[in-house]
Amino acid sequence: MSEYICLRDMAKKNSSTPMMEQYLRIKKDYQDALLFFRLCDFYEMFYEDAKIASPVMEIALTSRQKIPMCGVPYHAADLYLGKLLRRGFKVAICEQVEDAKLARGVVKRDVIKVLTPGTAIELELEGANESNYIASLFLKDKGWGLALIDLASGQMRAAQSDSQDKRVLPDELFKVSPREIVFPEEEEKHVIEILSSHNRISILKSPLEDWAFDYSQAKNILEGHFKVKSLAGFDLADKDMAVSAAGALLYYLKKLRKDSLSLIDKVSYAQSGTEMILDAATIKNLELVKNL
């Protein structure tokens, strides 16, 4: 079957075409994201994704063979992606990964990256002068660990507190107005309570596998990324909770973006309660906090 026949036309013939089967296989691995499926000169969306995205992107919802669908031109994709990300959606970008002219049957496709409000440095969501922070939160009975990354600048910071007073946590977390927060799946209810109590429920909440916050796992990820044998040079040698938060955040970003994140070349540690995660001069100079 020729790759030049667009899926809209194929869907007229049969909703179980090889290309639709390919779409469904890929979508199965990205149930928590809207899938932008590249076909010819468009990104297509189908089924519930189309129903959800079409009103947000302000485009028409159509259907073929009872399959809801909508599409946007690939050259204008940033405009529509921006609308979705500003509303807190996660979007998986699926591209052709082989030359259509050389393909036998359906062209191979794969998700090349997943965009979220905290990771979409390719897009200017709310202006070029604002940093785009993503946070990672690790809660324990004995305290908490926090990590922050701005992918635009490569700045990465981590902190932890042994205080069991969770009221201290939101102040540290909201100093930089993160667009997204990553946390262990088992802590989802607690994190939602924290965000709700401070009117920050609109922040994209991204639960992550609990094992990603395991200290040994997180430590290995950080040492591998920074190419060091010890985290002592970053003052993280005995900061288990900060390491867990930071390592899990790097793991999450590498999984979504599928790149080396080479811009992130160090992590700075700040002791909560005695030293601000971001000092006042840094906040002012880098404009890390929105004017309310």
Predicted segments with their positions:
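Charged catalytic and DNA/RNA-contacting regions of genome-maintenance
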Residues: 2-292
